[in-house]
Every structure is written in structure tokens, then in C-alpha cells.
């Protein structure tokens, strides 16, 4: 029988599969060009947990761009010499913090240290301020860090509050590298043991003793012949060295070839060499020469691979390339002919799994190589699967119509979509002054004039703008291949939903296909059973999920019904709870009087809208601003992640059981600094109609409702855990079918992604292990296979996945019937049945009938 840790696998694996984000660890460092000689950044300091070595966890603090997940090291800031850097810094820690730069120029008001007699320049918890630096005459590799000596802030350096600051010479880089890496030298103290590290990874010395399964520490990859640059920064109070196996470089200070360099505390150094030059491909160890430091983890592996060298694209500020690190910088206006966006999947690994064309030969995501999709994938995820139709009818129509007569031809073949398009702003981009003003902005962006369509013309946003002009190479419009060219602001705002963690709209398809039971259905020949999931979770790179084809109406997308097709049902009854709340009743009885043509930021509550809508509330980002995403203020998220504020007695108390995969690598913290900021924005929004006192009470009431519901879930989880430990559930895990996709879980994810303990359990049991509780225990609702899961497990899944979430939505949206009868009452009933069933199972186990 499995031990208790095995019984807790469900919660651990939940976040592993549904929220795993594959990222490349080596740096693609882009130069920030900014505007008018200045780069404007918004940065934050937040807590996080890092895993320097598998199974070793460190409570860190990290910097990040606004809304991003914090990292150690923080974001690389690379600018051209002479650029002004202005950073709006928000401190989301519980201790003071700052940003202090090395090397560049700044005033005493921007030093980031609380020196007596100078203006205060550290930032209290929850506060913000602007730091300004001048890089004129200061080229080089520097770094920035927190510089606080009071109220706990002095731990900033040891906790990870540092990042690289690179100033490129004013004349540019005459020999730019193909690959560029930043390496911080540091040590993390965990329970009294020092784990020496490059960046945030500490290698296992067993790798140096021939154990290929040992953790390699930090890894860097390059192709044979790549010009490689390493920026070394010693962020500790100890001296370190950096030694490269097989590679050497010219040290400019002595004009000699060397392969080892020493760095004093808080020193930096830059080295350049050619990958594999004279030594070939392979895995090369780079390490600190100090035996103690290397033995305790300060090494990494430089992987040189065969392959064609890619010319340098990363070092020069002259290129003006778009960078994700400076949202406000200029970029060249896209044109519809040449636009190739990178909003949805900027990372090459994600592109390969979700966007690179595969037709209908293979699926999507981490399991994509192991199933072939149903034909409807051509519409569910068109950027990867769309196949133009092959039909003799098209050939016959060409006799009657020219290839560019899209409207005339489709008026005969699909008149409905043409009629929709003719009513749209796409066909009538200058139908009134308001639309004309927006059209003028788009015309300037794309370099084309857009006039109202007239019969016989190709005016307006014609079919070819969104589908291409070649019918043989027809494509479906997505954010990346068309929408983002004319609507880059909306596209960028929409994609920001990813920054707040899953679930979110941009990654809805990823969440769908990454669940193990999804691909398992396909392997059983039952892929069509997942169509219900596919229709809501279809790739939202297509804007028509909210703006229906072919009107693409903003007014339609502002109405709450636009959300109802997906946001309904037992696990998220948003529509049921909103439409039957007092808000929904007011909306239903007065909606024809509302002004749907106004942008949300222009709406006057009580005049244009007589009650709130989904969009008005959830797209609000604070300070009287609305954006094209709904994730900004999510505190409880979907509602299935255990909160830190509840003292759990079941295995939920140990969540997340050592698995540390951002962003879902910890319990929710309902009263963290970040959550308090979200709460402030909610109260700010609600105060447009209610008193701030009432709004605060309502949010507090929702929190307490959820805490009480989680305590009932905790009791149910504990009951089932004990049943498994008592071997009272039949058939036991080892005698029933394994967890879905168990044979691939080990193969595809491996020890590095599963974690050492989970990897061992799956390998030891071949997937014959109990999986219960949030969130992978939801497989109980999606599948049933010869006793796996059992009835009591199904009952528990319905408790936390249906009853709990129904109550959550009812309480949040002020619908009393759903809050109580669909939520609390149902959850209590689930718990009662679980208690009764547990007693029956124990009696069966003991062989007693006890009156039955």
C-alpha cells in the first residue's frame, strides 16, 4: 500500500500539468531603446520560492516587470549609453526595499539608500516611487540591487533582490554576440547549509562523478561557431572565480588568452569566445575554481550543439527590435502584408507546441506527439491546424468570379457571413465621427487608407486583410497573423492576462490540452467526447470568442451575454449567478436604454449603465482605467487553490508538497501585499456605486465564506486519505487501472519537471496511485475506468469542483440561492455522504454487516 505522500499526489500534480510553463533559461537580451532618449519601466519586488536544487527550496524576494512573475535574478536592463532610465518601482514585500544601481549616474534622491541628510529613497511596503538614472559616459556591465539596512530590508541581497544593468557603448557594439548570458554568483542558505549557485541554480556534484541523472545546475546552450558573451557578476561578499572547460578568451587587461578569471565581491566581468572552437560539441563544465564552492553547487553546463550558426540579433540597440522588457518603447508600424506578430507565443518552445503548423497529424501541448486531433481542430486552433478546404466548387466558381471578388462570391455561397460583415465597422470604417477617429489611428499605424466599402470595390477592411489574398493559402485570422497589426494595444493588453497566472484567457487552450485525461480520451478513441471542453477552451488567439464573426462588434463584446456561453455550468456558474442577481435583474429590465457604443472608460455609472456588467467590473485595472483583459484583480482565482490562511489538517496543509513551478507554486495568500492591492482596486471600482465601507465588508464576507468552505473540503480530504492508508477502498490503487497517461508522465516530464519525489512515486507504482483533491482529482468527473475512481472519490470531486465553486460564484455575485442551495447546502450534503460511505467501507473492510 502506498504511504501518505502517495495519496497526496493529486494536489501536487494538479499544478504540474495545468500550469506548467516551459521557458528557455538562457537569456535573449534585448536592448531597450525607449522614446526621446528615455526608457520607462514599471518594476515590482515580490516574494517567491525558488528551487536551487531539486527538493531544496528557498524563500526568496525577486524583482519583475509590473504584473510579471518575480525572478532571481531580476530582469536584465540593457540600454545604449546616454539613455535615461526611469523606473516606477512598487514594493509588494512586507519589508522596505529599493533599487540601487552600480556604475551609472544618479542624484542623492535616487540612490536607493536611506542615508541621513539625503532625501528618503527607500520604498515602504505597499508604496511606490520613481528612480531615475543617467547612463551618459558609463558603458559597461553593472548591476542593481536593494540597498536597505532597516526593518528586515537588509535581507534583500541574500534573498535575491538583484539584476543586471548593461550599458552598451554609444557607438554600438562592433562585434555583437550571437548568444549572451548573465551569470550571477551567489549562495543560498537553506537550514544552515550553503548552496553555492550560478543565478538561482546549484548543481549536484554527483554530476561531476559521472551520475547523468544528477542535477546539472545552470545550463547554457549554443550552436557550434556561435559567438558567445558571458556577463559575470559576483553578488556575494566572497571572492569567486569562473573557469571554463575547453574554452578560452582574450583578456583585454593583459592581452592574453585565459580560461579562468577571479571576481572580487560585487565585481563584474565580461568575456567573449566562440562556442566549440577547436574542441567541438559536447557538455562543458563551467565552475568556480574554489573546491568548496564547486562541491557545494557553483557550477553549470555549457552545451554546445551541432547546428547552423544564427547571426547576431540580440546585442545592438540600433536594431530597434521589439522587447518584452520595455512595454512603452517604439516599434516599427506593422503592415498587413508583412505583419507577423508574436503576441500569443513569444517563446519558441510554446510556438512549437501550440502555434507551429502541424495540420491534423499531431496534437498540441506536452502530449501533442501522442495523439492526432479531430478535424474540428482546424477551427479550434487555426494557427496550428487550419487546412484550407479542397473543393471542385471553388474551381467552378472561378469561372463566374475573379479570385479577388470575395464579397460577390460569398454572397452566393455563404450569404450570412457577408451580411454580418456589411454591418460591421470593418466594412464601414468611417460610418460616423467616433469610428472615423479610431480608423485614422489605424491608418497611421498600417500606412493604408480605409474607406467605407461599396459594391464592386475592395474598400473597408476587406476579406484579404484577415484571410490573405490567395484562396489556395487561406488562413483564419488570429491575434498574431492579423488582428494585432491593426489593434496592437488591445492585443498586448489581452496577452497581459498571462502575467497573472492561470487560469487566464490567453492560455485557455494550453490548460485544456495539458490535462492528462484529455490525451487519454484520444488514446482510447474517444476524442470527440472532449468537444465540450474544446469549444470553450479553444485557442483564444482568435478574437471572435468575444467579438463574433463577422461583425466583430465591440458593443456585443461589452454585453454580459458575450461571457455567458462559457462562464456557466456547475464549476463556474458566473452567468447563472449574475443574471439572477439584483444586478442582472436591473440589466435585463433596462438594457435597451444602455449606451453600448461607449468605451468602458467613458461609461458613466447610473447614466450609461444602470448596473455593473462582467466587462465593466473585471476589465477594470485601477485608477479609472480599463484594459482588454479580465485577470488583473483575481484574488481567489478560479477558487480551487488552497489558501494559506486556512489551517488544514489533511494533506492540504503540506501543499504544494515540494513542487515549485511558477506561477502556481504555492498556496494562495488572500491577505498578501499583492492581494491587498487587488482588493484596493475592487473597492475603488465598487465605490462608483456603493460606499467603500460596504464594498470592503462584501469582500471580507466572500473571504470568510471561502475559508469555511475550504475547512469542509479539508475534512473530506482527510477522510479519504485515511481510507487509503487503511486499505479500505476497493479496488486498491495497485489493483485498478493507473492514473490517465501514467506511462507518458515519467517519459515526457522526467525528474526535473516532476520533482524527485513525484518521479520516484510514479516510477515505483507505474501510475497505480491514488489521485484525489484539487485539482487533478477532477479526473473523477471526466473519466471512469474499472473502479478508478471509486464512488467516494467522485463524490469528493463534485464537492470541491462543483458545490464549492457554485457557492463561490453565488457569494461573489450576490445571488443568494446559488450561494446557499447550490453551494453550501450541496457541499454539506457531499460531506455527509462521504462520512456515511467511509463508515460503510470500513465495515466492509472489517467484515461486519452491523445490521445491514
UniProtKB/Swiss-Prot annotation:
Which positions are annotated as binding Cu cation 2?
Answer: 145
Q: What is its main location?
A: other
UniProt similarity note: In the N-terminal section; belongs to the multicopper oxidase family.
Residues that, per the record, bind heme 2? 463, 466-467, 550
Q: Which SUPFAM superfamilies match?
A: Cupredoxins, Multiheme cytochromes
Name of the featured protein: Probable nitrite reductase-hydroxylamine oxidoreductase fusion protein
This entry's Enzyme Commission designation comes to 1.7.2.1, 1.7.2.6
* Organism encoding this protein: Kuenenia stuttgartiensis
* Residues where heme 5 binds: 543, 546-547
Q: List the disulfide bonds.
A: none
InterPro entries from the UniProt entry: Cu-oxidase-like_N (IPR011707), Cu-oxidase_C (IPR011706), Cu-oxidase_fam (IPR045087), Cu_oxidase_CS (IPR033138), Cupredoxin (IPR008972), Multihaem_cyt_sf (IPR036280)
Its catalytic activity? hydroxylamine + 4 Fe(III)-[cytochrome c] + H2O = 4 Fe(II)-[cytochrome c] + nitrite + 5 H(+); nitric oxide + Fe(III)-[cytochrome c] + H2O = Fe(II)-[cytochrome c] + nitrite + 2 H(+)
Segment forming the signal sequence: 1-27
Q: What else is known?
A: In the construct expressed anaerobically in E.coli contains only the nitrite reductase domain (residues 28-327).
Residue ranges of domain Plastocyanin-like in the record: 72-169, 217-307
